[in-house]
């Protein structure tokens, strides 16, 4: 069972569910099976499960839990980023909270997010390769160059920058780009890493 099935479980079309064809109905996962598997996955990958469930609007509590997990991670690695490491305690905590909140919002974006769908590929992540289409005489697709194949635009990092400057008024754009934005980007990446870990654990416990 993969994480995507967890989202489907919360709006089921039937009381039984399965990721793949099964020999018999008894091999499918019941609601009790799914809840037990989710509990096991949460105990081993709490960050990833909270991030995913919050992303899919399954729980407002999970959204806040995911941001809290992300803040803990940010505190842990903040010493590597001089623009954050040198900040005073209270200011640093507030900046990390802002970065974690915006990074999680970026992670949550998808082609279904209002206004985020790529205008070039309309959310498919694929675009027509005009040169090869003309060369081969048939439609040839390639990764959409505008969205890099994801089907949607990322949240502009400038939004996080503006929020951080409310706490650090003298933070210039170049300094942000060199010393703070790398941490913001790392937080977004960490969300995806934690989701992948949770997905693998959930798959393992439901085999």
Curated annotation (Swiss-Prot):
Q: Where are the zinc fingers (unnamed)?
A: 118-147
The protein's GO terms of the molecular function aspect are:
DNA binding; zinc ion binding
Residues annotated as binding Zn(2+) are 118, 121, 144, 147
Q: Which gene encodes it?
A: 23
Q: Cite the position(s) of the site with description Interaction with host rpoB.
A: 101, 160, 165
Q: Where is this region: Disordered?
A: 1-28
Extent of the signal sequence: none
The family line of this record is: Belongs to the phage antitermination Q type 2 family.
InterPro entries in alphabetical order: Antitermination_sf, Antitermntn
Tell me, what is an example of a GO biological process annotation in this record?
transcription antitermination
Source organism per entry reads Bacteriophage PS34
Q: Which residues bind DNA?
A: 171-192
Question: Which of UniProt's keywords are assigned here?
Answer: DNA-binding, Host-virus interaction, Metal-binding, Transcription, Transcription regulation, Transcription termination, Zinc, Zinc-finger
- UniProt keyword Coiled coil present: no
Enumerate the Pfam families for this protein: Antiterm
Q: What is this protein called?
A: Antitermination protein Q
The feature of type site (Interaction with host RNA polymerase sigma factor RPOD) is located at 134
Q: Tell me the function of this protein.
A: Mediates the switch from middle to viral late gene expression by associating with host RNA polymerase (RNAP) so that the latter can read without pausing and through transcription terminators preceding late genes. Competes with host factor sigma 70 for binding to RPOB, the beta-subunit of host RNAP. To join the elongation complex, binds a specific DNA Q-binding element (QBE) and interacts with RNAP that is paused during early elongation. Participates in the lysis-lysogeny decision by activating the expression of the late lytic genes.
Q: HAMAP family from the xrefs?
A: Antitermination_lambda
Outline the subunit composition: Interacts with host RPOB (via flap domain); this interaction renders host RNAP resistant to transcription pausing and allows it to read through termination signals. Interacts with host RNA polymerase sigma factor RPOD (via domain-4). Interacts with host NusA (via N-terminus and AR2 domain); this interaction releases the autoinhibition of NusA.
């Amino acid at each position: 069972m993969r994480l995507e099935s967890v989202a489907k479980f919360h709006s089921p079309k039937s009381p039984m569910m399965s990721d793949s064809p099964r020999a018999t109905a008894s091999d499918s996962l019941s609601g009790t099976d799914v809840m037990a598997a989710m509990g096991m996955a949460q105990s081993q990958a709490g960050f990833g499960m909270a991030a995913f469930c919050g992303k899919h609007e399954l729980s407002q509590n999970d959204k806040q839990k995911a941001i809290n997990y992300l803040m803990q991670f940010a505190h842990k690695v903040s010493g590597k980023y001089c623009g954050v490491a040198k900040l005073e305690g209270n200011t640093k905590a507030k900046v990390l909270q802002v970065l974690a909140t915006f990074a999680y919002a970026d992670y949550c974006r998808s082609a279904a997010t209002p206004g985020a769908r790529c205008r070039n590929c309309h959310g498919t992540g694929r675009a027509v390769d005009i040169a090869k289409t003309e060369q081969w005489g048939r439609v040839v697709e390639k990764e959409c160059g505008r969205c890099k194949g994801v089907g949607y635009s990322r949240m502009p990092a400038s939004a996080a920058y503006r929020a951080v400057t409310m706490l650090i008024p003298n933070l210039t754009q170049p300094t942000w780009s060199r010393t703070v934005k790398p941490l913001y980007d790392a937080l977004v990446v960490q969300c995806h890493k934690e989701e992948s870990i949770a997905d693998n654990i959930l798959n393992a416990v439901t085999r």
